[in-house]
Curated annotation (Swiss-Prot):
It comes from Nicotiana plumbaginifolia. Chlorophyll a 6 binds at H246, A255. Binds at least 14 chlorophylls (8 Chl-a and 6 Chl-b) and carotenoids such as lutein and neoxanthin. Chlorophyll b 1 binds at Y58. Chlorophyll b 2 binds at R104, V153, L182. This is Chlorophyll a-b binding protein E, chloroplastic. The modification N2-acetylarginine is found at R35. Chlorophyll b 3 binds at S157, E173. InterPro entries: Chloro_AB-bd_pln (IPR001344), Chloroa_b-bind (IPR022796). Chlorophyll a 5 binds at K213, Q231. The light-harvesting complex (LHC) functions as a light receptor, it captures and delivers excitation energy to photosystems with which it is closely associated. The lineage of its organism: Eukaryota, Viridiplantae, Streptophyta, Embryophyta, Tracheophyta. The N-terminus of the protein extends into the stroma where it is involved with adhesion of granal membranes and post-translational modifications; both are believed to mediate the distribution of excitation energy between photosystems I and II. Residues 1-34 form a transit peptide. Chlorophyll b 4 binds at Q165, R176.
Length: 266
């Protein structure tokens, strides 16, 4: 019997399921055993400016030649790797996963740092809206209440908060690391299925562009979080308060003026 191949759509975005019986799987009584394997996503159109050898580079037309191992296959590849961190395929795969995960945490974190302060400036009452001061409210006399509502979530116990963090984050990380808790074909970075209820990944070309947008915004968010940490250490204020101070007096409230405060003898 001639071998046949059938492609079926998978519930996970960017994946296809290949049913490919080999000659050894076809028995004499005509019974066929199907084997499920993960197929690669459809290649991105050569017209995309973010992929392939002609993609946008880190210095535009002055970038020079990219390393041979940076082929433009993955989102966010601008052909720059002076430290050679991507030369080893296994190391590159690990670093790529870590970057995407940290990008997502940074985007959530940056929003979480700015949004409460924004609400507080518009009349919403918080015990403490500045992100690096909020946690210490649990030691205050009134304790810590979510959104100012003492009955919403009981947050007076540090041990209870710690336990919730361990259980909730541990469950998510366990799901991600295990990869296939339900025996399904899963991409740990872009699982699709239930994680894509809006169907944003149904069009391969649109999905490829969304990956680029995610990694670009994630990298900006990581730099933002670094800036928030530095601001907290130097000024002791939240990001929006620092922005307001800078707009009110840009000459005396900027990175250079704060940096010169640490010059010996000043």
């Amino acid at each position: 019997m001639a071998a046949s191949t059938t492609a079926l759509s998978s519930p996970f975005a960017g994946k296809a399921v290949k049913l490919s019986p080999s000659s050894s799987e076809v028995t004499g009584n005509g019974k066929v055993t199907m084997r499920k394997t993960a197929n690669k996503a459809k290649p991105v159109s050569s017209g995309s400016p973010w992929y392939g050898p002609d993609r946008v580079k880190y210095l535009g037309p002055f970038s020079g030649e990219s390393p041979s191992y940076l082929t433009g296959e993955f989102p966010g590849d601008y052909g720059w790797d002076t430290a050679g961190l991507s030369a080893d395929p296994e190391t590159f795969a690990k670093n790529r996963e870590l970057e995407v995960i940290h990008c997502r945490w940074a985007m959530l974190g940056a929003l979480g740092c700015v949004f409460p302060e924004l609400l507080a400036r518009n009349g919403v009452k918080f015990g403490e809206a500045v992100w690096f001061k909020a946690g210490s409210q649990i030691f205050s006399e009134g304790g810590l209440d979510y959104l100012g509502n003492p009955s919403l979530v009981h947050a007076q116990s540090i041990l209870a908060i710690w336990a919730c963090q361990v259980v909730l984050m541990g469950a998510v990380e366990g799901y991600r690391v295990a990869g296939e808790p339900l025996g399904e074909v899963v991409d740990p970075l872009y699982p699709g299925g239930s994680f894509d209820p809006l169907g944003l990944a149904e069009d391969p070309e649109a999905f490829a562009e969304l990956k680029v947008k995610e990694i670009k915004n994630g990298r900006l968010a990581m730099f933002s979080m670094f800036g928030f940490f530095v601001q907290a250490l130097v000024t002791g204020k939240g990001p929006l308060e620092n922005l307001a101070d800078h707009l009110a007096d840009p000459v005396n409230n900027n990175a250079w003026s704060y940096a010169t405060n640490f010059v010996p003898g000043k």
